[in-house]
C-alpha cells in the first residue's frame, strides 16, 4: 500500500470583540475567504483559522498572518483581543483529496480525516471506521 502523507500546519485564533455596535451574529456562521476560515461563535467572539501547506512551524505573528486576507481591517477587528491561540500538525494526502478512507485489505483500513477547511471530519470518519470494523467482524 503506497499512501503518501505530508504534515501541514493548522493555526487559529479566537478574538473577543468589545464593541457594542458590532454584532458578529449578523455574519454567516462559517465562511471562507482565500483559504482563511472565519467562524462566528457569538455576538462578540470570532475564530479565524487556516492551514499552511508549506510549513509546520507556528507563526509568531499569527494575528497578522490570519487577517492579512483583508485589504483594510475593520477597526473593531484591530481593537479585538486574542483570547485563545492554537495550532496543530495534521496529515494531508499527497496526490489525492482528504480524507482518505480506504479498506486496503482484509482487516486493514486507513482513515486520515480529522479536520479540514474548518470542518471537523472526525465524527463522520469515526462512523465510517466503526462500520468497516462491524462489517469485518460479521
Model features per residue range: what roles?
Residues 1-105:
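Active-site substrate-recognition segment that forms the wall
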Residues 19, 52, 114-115, 125:
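A broadly conserved detector of short glycine/acidic/proline-rich loop/turn motifs that flank catalytic sites
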Residues 60, 122-123:
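Conserved strand-to-helix beginnings and helix N-cap segments that scaffold or border functional pockets
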Residues 66, 101, 115, 133-137:
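Generic hydrophobic, helix-prone segments enriched in Leu/Val/Ile
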Residues 108-122:
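Glycine-rich phosphate/pyrophosphate-binding beta-alpha loops
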Residues 123-138:
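Internal hydrophobic alpha-helix adjacent to the cofactor/substrate pocket in enzyme cavities
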Amino acid at each position: 500500500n503506497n499512501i503518501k502523507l505530508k504534515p501541514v500546519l493548522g493555526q487559529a485564533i479566537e478574538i473577543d470583540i468589545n464593541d457594542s455596535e458590532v454584532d458578529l451574529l449578523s455574519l454567516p456562521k462559517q465562511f471562507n475567504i482565500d483559504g482563511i476560515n472565519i467562524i462566528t461563535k457569538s455576538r462578540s467572539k470570532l475564530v479565524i483559522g487556516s492551514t499552511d501547506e508549506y510549513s509546520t512551524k507556528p507563526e509568531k505573528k499569527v494575528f497578522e498572518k490570519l487577517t492579512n486576507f483583508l485589504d483594510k481591517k475593520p477597526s473593531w477587528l484591530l481593537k479585538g483581543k486574542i483570547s485563545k491561540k492554537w495550532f496543530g500538525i495534521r496529515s494531508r494526502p499527497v496526490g489525492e483529496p482528504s480524507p482518505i478512507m480506504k479498506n486496503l485489505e482484509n482487516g486493514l483500513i486507513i482513515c486520515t480525516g480529522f479536520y479540514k477547511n474548518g470542518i471537523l471530519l472526525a465524527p463522520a470518519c469515526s462512523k465510517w471506521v466503526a462500520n468497516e470494523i462491524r462489517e469485518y467482524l460479521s
